[in-house]
Amino acid sequence: MIILAAGKGKRMHSSLPKVMHKVGGKSMLEHVLISAKKLNPSSINVVLSPKIESIKKSFGGYDIAWHSQSEQKGTADAVKIVLPSLKKDEKVLILYADTPLIDSNLLDKFINYMPKSDVKVLTVNLEKPFGYGRIIREQAEEEIISKIIEETEADDLQKNIKECNTGIIFSDVSTLNSLISEVKNDNSKKEFYLTDIVSIANLKNMMVVPLLSKETNSLLGVND
């Protein structure tokens, strides 16, 4: 399991690291760790920015492998940092530390959904999807995702799409290595987007399937 926690959280307007802001008396990262532990993963890997490594001492009660993303090169780069420490056939659930309400039962359902797929993406319909990556299907009812387009790269038509990427992805180490190695940073932010693995997987004739969840509130990230 990989938890991405290296985001700067500029919109929080606070000197406190984003993932350390409290929700219901616990930090956002601790909420995600609690849900993660319930799934009994073989390992929990958390990716941090070097600037907030001091938060490690707050999680001494958890068995965590910490990883440092020295430069903010994007989510694909953050995952790439962890992969060499994992077994090639290991299954990987990718979570974000700023989704504190994520439910372990939903994650368990997601992990076991469509077991023969190569990549799984947890999605949600939002009435106000601004800021989220949009899910692109060749046909509206099709059970295969062709690509995920980030808000900053989407055209006006794509911005009208309500189905959004939660960021939660499930695959295996070998597949992720293969796909991430081909991710490029030719976008407006010059970052390596993890979402680009979807279109790359399609080019490789891999099966990328979405699980559209109705649990909207538990899947929303915290930005302010």
What residues fall within each predicted segment?
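Short glycine-enriched, charge-decorated loop/helix-capping segments at active-site entrances
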Residues: 16-22, 183-186
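Short aromatic/basic micro-patch
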Residues: 22, 101, 170, 221-222
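Conserved N-terminal catalytic core of the sugar/cofactor nucleotidyltransferase
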Residues: 26-112
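An accessory alpha-helical subdomain
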Residues: 189-194, 213-223
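Conserved core of the sugar-phosphate nucleotidyltransferase
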Residues: 62, 102-188, 195-197, 206
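N-terminal nucleotide-binding beta1-loop-alpha1 segment
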Residues: 1-14
